[in-house]
Amino acid sequence: MTTLHRPSRRGHWALATLGGVIGVLGAVLLTGGVWLAALGGSWYYAPAGVALLIAGVLLFRGRNAGAWWFAAVVAATLPWTWWESGSDYWRWVPRLGLIVGLAFVLALLLPKLERPVSRAVSRSVAGVLAAVFVVAFALAFVPFGGTEADGALAHAAGMAAGLVKRSASAAPAASDGQPGNAPADDDWAAYGRSQAGQRYSPLQQINRDNVAQLKQAWVFHTGDLPSKRWGAETTPLKVGDSLYLCTARNQVIALDAASGKERWRYDPKVKDEAIPYTAACRGVSYYQVPVAANDAAAAVAAEGAPLCRTRIIEGTLDGRLIALDARSGKPCTDFGNNGQVDITVGMGQTPPGYVSINSPPAIVRGVVVTGHQVLDGQKRYEPSGVIEGFDAVTGQLRWAWDMTHPDWNGAPPPGQTWTRGTPNMWTTAAADEQLGYVYLPMGNSTADYWSSSRTPQENRYATSLVALDVTTGKPVWNFQTTHIDAWDYDLGSQPSLIDFPKDGVNVPAVLLPSKQGELYVLDRRTGKPLVGVEERAVPGGGVEPQMRAKTQPFSLYHTLRKPDLTERDMWGMTPIDQLVCRIQFRKASYKGIYTPPEADRHSIEYPGYNGGSDWGSVSVDPQRGVIVANYNDMPNYNLLVPRAKADKLGWAPRDEARGDAGGAEGAGDPQAGTPYAINVNAGWRLPFTKLLCKQPPYGGIRAIDLASGKTLWDRPFGSARGNGPFGIRSGLPIEIGTPNNGGSVVTASGLIFIAAATDDLIRAIDLSTGKELWHAKLPAGGQANPMVYAYNGREYLVIMAGGHHFMETPAGDAVVAYALPQQAP
């Protein structure tokens, strides 16, 4: 007769609890698995759920067969995981992590079964599984999904650098002595260092050999303490002995370049009601009044008004341009109305928060060229996206470009306004002083996700790079990156002006990144592509099938975009949330990039509206011939909501008592005046775990050969320190590749400096290999572009640590500078 083992009460309850957990897991996988299979998805989950349910019931009763059923699930899951995932580490995590963890617990409880397994066997099995866990955890610290530096490609980049070095300059030479056009080596005189927008510094005191010695040199707190809705995103300027920056609410501050101490401050008194969905001031502009203009202004100066020989021009969140004396911070009274110009004049009704300048204006040939942000998603006919050009000395309107009224060149005729709802330019322009052109990265018409009511002029210029002649205010050419945009794929990146090697000569070019991840190279004189652009067929349908373009432009030069999503790309912390994401994927409309939005089911937008490349743009090393691009790799999960339902939900425009959402752009936006509101799940996150449905990495950084467009290296960018399930910051230095906002700086010494990721670090990266050489912890999120300058023979790296509401990084008000110790060689 066989004697059955009766486990202790504690052992019985432990085994029963484990059986219950496994049984519940099985029931969930069975239910969801049947649903997924019915949708045409994977058949793994349903049979795995059956086996786990049986295993759970048997283990609850203490039966040995339960262990065998569970072992069968493990044995079947291993080859299935390899078939779906190959050697991709992050794909293994949700498929095997929980299963192996439960197997480890079961191994420890084997002696408690009805027919007990020996403790030696139990410990051996548990030991093997524990070793698997240790190895798997260690592998998490190895970056996956990248491309290592290749010697052949590096050689090709060196050849390109030789060609670029022979050119006079990789940026257009200045003709008027403006620091923003040709900054001194020690300076950072415009948002992208120069108006060419390359984000390249010729300094090389800090290099690969000593960068690990960087220490905090000084920190300055602006005192404009942010709430969850604010994130300054500012990149300071440095000209001469001073830094110039703006805070989240547009206070302008000058700092001593050596000590970081405040020289002066100007507060334009921007009210909180003027803040759109986030308070961002990405920078200010610097202008040096030419001598001839000084002479013309002498009479004004004699009457006691400040001359403002050098001036800081700032755009504010409430739609003003302000000119300040760079030395004293006092308003330039010869500019507009006592130092201010209201850009909303001529726009008609402009509720607070609807018209905001959040990026520094370009100044070309004495003309301040400004666009503005129009609050997204509220109405079809919001204020105009008109581009305005003002005299940099007097503030007088030189011209205005309203795309639907090309015959208007100044203020609108009496009783009329600039056309409402037209595409706007909310980001930073680039400028060529020699050509007299300003390059405008245009956004979309208001109501991003409904296109039927747009005019032909809107459809021509929306989501385009427009070259405008600053003398006339007229467009010279435009290049469109999305035809009839219904995805919020506006151009967020500042273009970069470069010399591009073609047919043995260097051609004046503009490098244009897009949110879709495309990099276009255009002749900046004509707008013609210097490397092929192919019109490819894209999906049709959606709620406006008659409006969808049959083709879209794809660059043959380079793309940051990854392959289309598949069900296998769905992720999670466990098989359960991964299963939920798989079901959502199968339920949604997805036909690849440019899948049209729908109202009867969700649609997947991939890449999402945060890029690809967004407002941080790219940096360019013109000497080595290398482009550095950090990028996002996340989808959005979108749904058009019929008007009647949106009204019941209370989705109304902000000025109609909608209130302040303070959340992600597009999340419950009413789009009044169209048949549909829009609900965007930006990043496609599950509400409970707050994890993204797509597998990592979610962001990367890449070096690209300028001449050929080939990838030199590509790595996940950003660690999991600031991320984790349920919104808990894990603190783990795992280079998972996180979402990122903000750009990089490249120096002549071969270093990349960048913050941008969600882990609140600023990094130094070797340009030649992509390897991290140094990092420092910031006091808040580093969602801003850094800058580099030198003063009194010492090189400094500066970053604004202000945080970001959508990225959910800590908010702050710190401007932090790093430098080598004084005694360092």
Q: What label would you give each PLM region?
A:
Residues 101-109, 125-133, 138-141, 147, ...:
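Hydrophobic or amphipathic alpha-helical targeting/insertion segments
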Residues 195, 201-211, 216-244, 269-271, ...:
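Asp/Glu-centered strand-loop micro-motifs enriched in Gly/Pro and often flanked by an aromatic residue
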Residues 210-223, 252-274, 288-294, 321-352, ...:
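Extracytoplasmic/lumenal domain signature
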Residues 149-217, 403-408, 573-599, 673-674, ...:
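Blade/loop signatures of beta-propeller domains
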Residues 430, 552, 556-634, 644-645, ...:
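Long, low-complexity segments enriched in small/aliphatic residues
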Residues 2-158:
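Topology signature of small-to-medium multi-pass alpha-helical membrane proteins
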